[in-house]
Regions:
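Histidine-acidic metal/acid-base catalytic patches
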Residues: 51, 55, 77-91, 101-166
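Active-site acidic/histidine proton-transfer and metal-coordination neighborhood
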Residues: 2-92
Length: 166
């Protein structure tokens, strides 16, 4: 509640949310291939809880923007699409271009398919040579980050024109 009030006081347009339980994003020893995944029973509980949190946030005048993220239970394009398809319309989408490309997904496709739910973006670029090395060697997310996989838009391999047109 304290964080929510701070965001409201700052006139934030939304609150970004990502499920990071058991995330491997900061672990220097666990490769991304060992990230957590949800079984069907846990998925149903997860969706129920996301919907409940989102409804509470809407009641407070602050939409929830779900952030897919490397090393978490919602990482890939398919997982992100499934999350949006499974949740109420109150759950909005944040697309992070860098994380989506890192997960071998398509930000343009997500934006087109879920434009009515898209509320926020993080424009990160990716250095392809570092991404390729990280994927080939099953690096940890932390190592890929420290190696410089992410960069500012225009300094990497993402073509932002199609994404921004959506």
């Amino acid at each position: 509640r304290k964080q929510l009030n701070l965001f409201k006081d700052c006139k934030a347009p939304c609150m970004v949310f990502a499920e990071v339980t058991d995330s491997v994003q900061g672990d220097p020893k666990v490769p991304l291939s060992k990230r957590p995944k949800l079984n069907e029973d846990v998925w149903k509980k997860f969706i129920f809880r996301i919907n409940e949190i989102s409804k509470m946030m809407i009641d407070e005048g602050m939409p929830l923007a779900y952030h897919h993220h490397m090393g978490t239970v919602i990482e890939t394009e398919n997982e992100t699409a499934r999350l949006i398809e499974s949740t109420d319309d109150s759950v909005k989408l944040l697309i992070d271009t860098g994380h989506m490309l890192f997960a071998q997904g398509n930000s343009v496709k997500l934006a087109k398919n879920f434009s009515q739910r898209l509320i926020h973006v993080h424009c990160k670029d990716i250095r392809k040579n570092i991404l390729d090395h990280s994927l080939k060697n099953d690096s940890t997310f932390r190592q890929a980050f420290l190696d410089g996989a992410f960069t500012v838009p225009g300094d990497g391999c993402i073509d932002y024109k199609p994404f921004l047109k959506v």
